[in-house]
């Protein structure tokens, strides 16, 4: 659980944004405490390690935290999650903070950057989030989780066609994929159909703007005889 003695109010410039985010995606007091601890840590590390775009800091809660939390409503029964390229912790650490209240809930956070992986480990330690950090390329870490994951996620990591290639072994074993995408979602869907057969469900982001969530439940290669394309390492 988040260390309440270390909890401090959000900076004044973020207070209104936090309130707006929690109106969009309400959470328990315990999860809010974990998220407060996470945001405070992220702001400390941001000064020395570029975890998120500085231009988005004024909307950290709505642009990043709420954007991540909204995935939970699309997979309410999912217990085990796998987050590709967790980076600064969106959505992985946010999900771990929320799932800490769920019996058996956990997130595996895959990140190949050593500094970012160190931040993710510290974030899980400080918040008490339910998760584990895996320092590896996505393509090198997927097969071990086939049949063990309920939901796979990714945000600002790779084009959709590559994400599908990585996630296919998990989806084949029953996992749902939820990929957060932006204004180029139509172009990415068009490109992905060149390699994959799939029927996506598109959900507009609760945070507004041009964000979308691509939900996938079944995928197959366009050419069944060709090797499964995994794309470049990420």
Swiss-Prot record:
Its EC number is 2.1.1.170. The keyword Transmembrane does not apply. It holds the Pfam family GidB. It is an enzyme of class 2 (transferase). This is Ribosomal RNA small subunit methyltransferase G. The keyword Methyltransferase applies. It comes from Rhodopseudomonas palustris (strain BisB18). One of its GO terms (cellular component) is cytosol. Specifically methylates the N7 position of guanine in position 527 of 16S rRNA. Keywords: Cytoplasm, Methyltransferase, rRNA processing, S-adenosyl-L-methionine, Transferase. It catalyses: guanosine(527) in 16S rRNA + S-adenosyl-L-methionine = N(7)-methylguanosine(527) in 16S rRNA + S-adenosyl-L-homocysteine. S-adenosyl-L-methionine binds at residues 85, 90, 155. SUPFAM superfamilies: S-adenosyl-L-methionine-dependent methyltransferases. The gene is rsmG. Transmembrane segments: none annotated.
């Amino acid at each position: 659980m988040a260390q309440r003695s270390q909890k401090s109010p959000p900076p004044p410039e973020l207070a209104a944004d936090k309130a707006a985010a929690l109106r969009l995606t309400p959470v328990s007091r315990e999860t809010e405490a974990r998220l407060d601890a996470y945001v405070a840590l992220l702001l400390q590390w941001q000064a020395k390690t570029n975890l998120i775009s500085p231009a988005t800091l004024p909307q950290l809660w709505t642009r990043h935290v709420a954007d991540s939390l909204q995935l939970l409503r699309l997979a309410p029964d999912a217990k085990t999650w796998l987050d590709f390229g967790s980076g600064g912790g969106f959505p992985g650490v946010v999900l771990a903070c929320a799932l800490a209240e769920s019996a058996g809930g956990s997130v595996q956070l895959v990140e190949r950057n050593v500094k970012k992986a160190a931040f993710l480990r510290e974030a899980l330690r400080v918040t008490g989030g339910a998760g584990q950090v895996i320092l590896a390329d996505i393509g090198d870490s997927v097969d071990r989780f086939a049949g063990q994951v309920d939901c796979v996620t990714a945000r600002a990591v790779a084009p959709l066609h590559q994400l599908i290639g990585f996630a296919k072994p998990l989806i084949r074993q029953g996992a749902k994929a939820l990929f957060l995408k932006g204004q180029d979602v139509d172009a990415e869907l068009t490109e992905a159909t060149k390699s994959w057969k799939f029927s996506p469900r598109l959900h507009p982001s609760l945070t507004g703007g041009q964000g979308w969530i691509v939900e996938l439940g079944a995928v197959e290669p366009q050419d069944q005889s060709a090797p499964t394309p995994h794309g470049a390492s990420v």
